[in-house]
Amino acid sequence: MTSIGASITHTDGFAVQPKDVDALLVGMGERYDVLVTLKDGVFPLVALAEGKAAAARALVRTSPQSAAPKPGQRPRELDGEVVRYAKLQPHEQVRLPQRRPDRTVRLELTGTMAAYDWAINGKKYDPETVAPVRSGERVRLSFVNRTTMWHPMHLHGHTFALPSGIRKDTVIVLPGSTLNVDFDADNPGLWMIHCHNIYHAESGMMTLLGYAAGSR
């Protein structure tokens, strides 16, 4: 949003140390709470689609006398700093206690647009394949993106901590990158891990993680 002071306060419902922001990279399923300071005028709110020329636009009007900007105007903030996860710090109340992971579950994100064969660890979703986890463990999910697209990965039933300490349940894994997140296995059940680009999940980029209460 142009010409407005903005500050991130939460991501996926968890508090962070307030961080001033020009622009955000938001994946499907991610949520951010942002406080904005409005002046008198008309301000465009613009969302660009990653990898496409399309954009969604809205206007925030605080003064009936102000003229609206031209529809094609690009807010200068879109060319400013795009805040990344590493720049955010958690509020102390939501920080996971320090602990070494008891196990690591490696999740390689694979597939191509040409074949549309999106998968995890080279295999399409199979309800009989369940990542082994035990109740009470600190589990590290290691997302390894082998594709040329970015994938917002979501874990059901839990929230996880990123290396910076912020808590989330959905995280963007950029092309060619590896991202480790940690969570506590404290909610027994059978839980989905999937790409929140739902057409990728439908193609096969999802798997299961499960454990029983008191399992050791």
Residue ranges and their predicted role:
Residues 48-52, 144-146, 196-200:
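Beta-strand-rich extracellular modules
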Residues 1-82, 166-169:
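Histidine- and aromatic-rich segments of cupredoxin/plastocyanin-like copper-binding domains
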Residues 41-44, 54, 147-151, 203:
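Short loop/turn segments at connectors of secondary-structure elements within structured domains
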Residues 180-216:
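TerminUS-proximal long segments
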Residues 1, 35-36, 41-47, 107, ...:
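Short, structured motif recognition centered on aromatic/hydrophobic residues
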Residues 13-14, 56-151, 157-161, 168, ...:
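Edge beta-strand plus adjacent loop/short-helix module at the start
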Residues 8-40, 127-134, 157-189, 215-216:
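Extracytoplasmic beta-sandwich strand-turn segments characteristic of Greek-key/jelly-roll folds
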Residues 4, 39, 50, 65, ...:
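Solvent-exposed coil/turn segments that connect beta secondary-structure elements
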